């Protein structure tokens, strides 16, 4: 693929492989995947060739809306808003993302300095579980994630290198509680990622854990 925009419009099926050519650079682009593989036939997002890792420089694109649909334990904590992610895996399972370089830089020209309180939330990889219960078989392997200039204040929003969250489902009686099973993160290198390196959030149900 020479552009990621076509990939975002594809319907991916179990066993499909989306391979980016090594040495290629995708500026102001992103991937948003909402399809799932199976245990025996996972979807693979990866690379081919012999050069450097293919690089996705998102630069604040790939915007989606995060909403825990539940106020947090402090009125000062932000629980909903827009997020920019190089790769978004939304309610997917049995998917492998490997052999990629990801950046998501801020823009000093419009005032996105390190400590700007209104800075865009940013991640390298965002993984979300919401309306399909248990999400299994998420593998992130050999990713080089750096220069992700997220918001250092909004700790419950998706900010950092890799951020996995569970959101309040629309119908918990029908779908069950969203959660993950069999998650593997291996041989990933992260640096200069704010606010977090690798983080997991289950914040929508915070009231069930406070004081436990």
What spans do the regions from the language model cover?
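Acidic Gly/Asp/Thr-rich repetitive segments characteristic of extracellular carbohydrate-active
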Residues: 1-30
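Right-handed parallel beta-helix/beta-spiral solenoid domain characteristic of secreted/periplasmic
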Residues: 17-26, 34-118, 147-153
